[in-house]
Amino acid sequence: MRAAGREKILSAPFDLIIFDCDGVLVDSEVISCRVHAELLTAHGYPISSDQVRRRFLGRSAWEAGREIEAELGRALPSDFDAQLKAAIFREFATTLEATPHMHETLAAIALPVCVASSGAPEKIRASLTRTRLHDRFAPHIFSATQVRNGKPAPDLFLFAAAQMGVPPARCLVIEDSVPGVTGARAAGMAVFGFHGGSHCRPGDEAALLAAGATANFDDMRELPAMIAQATDYTADIAST
């Protein structure tokens, strides 16, 4: 693939690239879904990792827990979230990797970047540190814990844009989940759907497009050229 030049990147119709973390920057979703499913099953809510992926991908663990408690008719253990976090951290410490070609992709993007993730701050920090991505984004790392409503609401994306001083219409979001795409579009932003993580399944591309993704891709090496060659999506967003 021909690498896009810095000049082209800077001439794109965007002033900020907002990255989701899990499933976009780091290939973590397959790990998180498996651990989440195992812990829920152990606490009396039998569920597979694929079911966790389909139901809760892109949403916060807190929201997932409240939904499950409503179905169970009882509360999960008071320390369930802490158990889940600890179990995921143990797995991440030895197995988590950056999404393939992520480092070279970020090196080719000269535009400002930030992270907007449904994860808790400590989880985001651990994920990015483990994969040597933290310093590329810090301190511009934003969590759903900083806003009232998580994805699919637009709150987190609007918060990130405001913190970075960029109008929503000049932002491009990179997302792997339907809630993330939905939230980005509700915020008035263009969004590229990424379906190249190890957790992705047939049909994900169509689901991202149906949710409003401006374009889709499955190889991070494609992203710099996609940004450089992008037409002005603001008119498209304004008309939808």
Predicted regions: what they are:
Residues 32, 36, 40, 61, ...:
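Hydrophobic alpha-helical core bundles mediating ligand binding, dimerization, or RNAP-core interactions
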Residues 42-46, 72-75, 132-136, 165-166:
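Short helix-capping segments at alpha-helix termini
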Residues 39-40, 60-75, 127, 161, ...:
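Helix-loop "lid/cap" segments that line or gate small-molecule binding pockets
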Residues 66-104:
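Metal-dependent phosphoesterase signature
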Residues 2-15, 107, 111, 120-240:
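Asp-based, Mg2+/Mn2+-dependent phosphohydrolase catalytic module
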Residues 2-54:
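Active-site neighborhood of HAD-like aspartate-dependent phosphohydrolases
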Residues 39-43, 101-111:
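A short, Lys/Arg-enriched amphipathic alpha-helix followed by its capping loop at the start of a domain
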Residues 27-30, 52, 56-59, 75, ...:
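Residues at secondary-structure transition points
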